[in-house]
Amino acid sequence: MEMTHYEKTPLIRQVFNNGKTNSWFYVKHEILQPGGSFKSRGIGHLIRKSNEEALSEGSGKLAVFSSSGGNAGLAAATACRSMALNCSVVVPKTTKPRMVKKIQSAGAKVIIHGDHWGEADEYLRHKLMAQESQHGSKTLYVHPFDNETIWEGHSTIVDEIIEQLKENDISLPRVKALVCSVGGGGLFSGIIKGLDRNHLAEKIPVVAVETAGCDVLNKSLKKGSPVTLEKLTSVATSLASPYIASFAFESFNKYGCKSVVLSDQDVLATCLRYADDYNFIVEPACGASLHLCYHPEILEDILEQKIYEDDIVIIIACGGSCMTYEDLVKASSTLNVS
């Protein structure tokens, strides 16, 4: 049986203890992807499509190269394993040892280089890939988020949601918002692509959630043009991109999306609460979106409307494997989370 680079994930109605007697929230569980996050969709799609093109051209199998702080590298490694491709991942020194082991266990060669993702990426592209090219190999560079083919892969999440709502006899006009966490804008861009393809981009607002300290989208919106962050300080390291993809920034304004910025303390509290409530461990990048389930007043405020009993909000639980429960407890203690 051929392995696939991504799976159709459950869309589950969940009741949150948030002071409301009804539940509006349907959660899309991307943590169940082969690579532990939504990144399996887009990165797997890029690798599969590029490999098929290389084979059709007679170039042979690709040598795949990924730079990542963790989740993108794991997605690349698991996708390559499903296609029997060699994969090299460069991670910065800040990457947790358990994440390095996860990527290695998925079959990739891991090189640790640089103090942050930018230095790891520079080394990957200008040293490792240059060396491989000299050997005559066909190489593929996998960016963590800023690639249109990756967005195309991520867009399948919207197709699935529409199909799953239909299976549950839920009409699309009942959907009042779709909530996702935003770092560099890869998932957000894919969602916009999927909504647009299904003629829903102007009908269903996307609520983009960031954490203070890596809120590059919100800061760009306030300035009126994309900015680059010199420092990334949030505990939600999977959202820590110094810039926002141009397509994401342009789409935000085009389709009237909404921006929310949360504190690290709020997000960590949600991660611990969600683990206690549902026995799911999510990292802060994922907890950012789930926070709105526990605090629907934030959602109503940003949408400037009440959410009623028959209304539905879709939450993308984007996944991620960068933190254990012990990591969450330790970070919460450091930040005095009550």
Swiss-Prot record:
It is found in: Cytoplasm. It comes from the Eukaryota. GO terms for cellular component: cytoplasm. Keywords: Cytoplasm, Gluconeogenesis, Lyase, Pyridoxal phosphate. Its cofactor is pyridoxal 5'-phosphate. It catalyses: L-serine = pyruvate + NH4(+). The modification N6-(pyridoxal phosphate)lysine is found at K39. Its EC number is 4.3.1.17. Pathway: Carbohydrate biosynthesis; gluconeogenesis. One of its GO terms (biological process) is isoleucine biosynthetic process. GO terms for molecular function: L-serine ammonia-lyase activity; pyridoxal phosphate binding; threonine deaminase activity. Belongs to the serine/threonine dehydratase family. This is L-serine dehydratase. It comes from Saccharomyces cerevisiae (strain RM11-1a) (Baker's yeast). The gene is SDL1.
